[in-house]
Amino acid sequence: MSDISKASLPKAIFLMGPTASGKTALAIELRKILPVELISVDSVLIYKGMDIGTAKPNAEELLAAPHRLLDIRDPSQAYSAADFRRDALAEMADITAAGRIPLLVGGTMLYFKALLEGLSPLPSADPEVRARIEQQAAEQGWESLHRQLQEVDPVAAARIHPNDPQRLSRALEVFFISGKTLTELTQTSGDALPYQVHQFAIAPASRELLHQRIEQRFHQMLASGFEAEVRALFARGDLHTDLPSIRCVGYRQMWSYLEGEISYDEMVYRGVCATRQLAKRQITWLRGWEGVHWLDSEKPEQARDEVLQVVGAIAG
């Protein structure tokens, strides 16, 4: 697309970053100044009843800056990148029609990628194929199926953990149905995002600072009642660790503690470590992202001013 045709597109802002980097605080600050409406880009914040462990914006913050695509699914329900793209595009169109600018804020990089580049057409789920895969897993274990995926699609296997049955099953299902690997099919993009996008990423200047922020926030969550929140989910009886919601960082570790598998101290240690690993993956995504303007979490006023300098003109 030419620069001239891009300039004629409606405007949008991406505010990306690892967990605990200060994205939400910056987005709320920007909403006070720019004619923007916020859309959450987070695969965990979609779930109702999962507030403390997800660092969901509180009632006061949401009053100051409402976020779209929060609390739209029960923890028992799935939500895909395709679901997100459909919903986000609808929200963006609604915001643009009202004469305002969509500001998409979050850390689920797969969602940002799906929105920006579009999604390749993948085969629909096949219950028979899925049942066959699950039967094989029951007989041989998911480790065996992961080795099978490594043989046909090493790129996907490197990205999918052996203990992630949902994604592992889907990758094998796609191959069995289509004869093509998930990697092959996802290299074919769908429709690009019909917006002129200004992209920002916020993170502390050093990994050590980010690790400190992550540990502090995890302890703040515990002090705010995170255990009670997960106990309420645990008591429902219909949730389990094969669900994406319960596999979320922090929730998975607290679930193991409630099941008596690990001690409280071990839960805290694993929760912090898992959050650090998540942040590392998010930063790895962003380091390879084109056209990103980096902001420093430790200098929030400067970060705000840099965003205003880049996008302020579009609000005039």
Curated annotation (Swiss-Prot):
The keyword ATP-binding applies. The record marks T108, R130 as: Interaction with substrate tRNA. Substrate binds at T19, A20, S21, G22, K23, T24. Belongs to the IPP transferase family. The keyword Metal-binding does not apply. The gene is miaA. One of its GO terms (molecular function) is tRNA dimethylallyltransferase activity. SUPFAM superfamilies: P-loop containing nucleoside triphosphate hydrolases. Catalyzes the transfer of a dimethylallyl group onto the adenine at position 37 in tRNAs that read codons beginning with uridine, leading to the formation of N6-(dimethylallyl)adenosine (i(6)A). It catalyses: adenosine(37) in tRNA + dimethylallyl diphosphate = N(6)-dimethylallyladenosine(37) in tRNA + diphosphate. Its EC number is 2.5.1.75. Monomer. The lineage of its organism: Bacteria, Pseudomonadati, Pseudomonadota, Gammaproteobacteria, Enterobacterales. Its cofactor is Mg(2+). Keywords: ATP-binding, Magnesium, Nucleotide-binding, Transferase, tRNA processing. ATP binds at G17, P18, T19, A20, S21, G22, K23, T24. Residues 42-45, 166-170, 247-252, 280-287 are annotated as: Interaction with substrate tRNA. One of its GO terms (biological process) is tRNA modification. It comes from the Bacteria. PANTHER family: TRNA DIMETHYLALLYLTRANSFERASE (PTHR11088:SF60). This is tRNA dimethylallyltransferase.
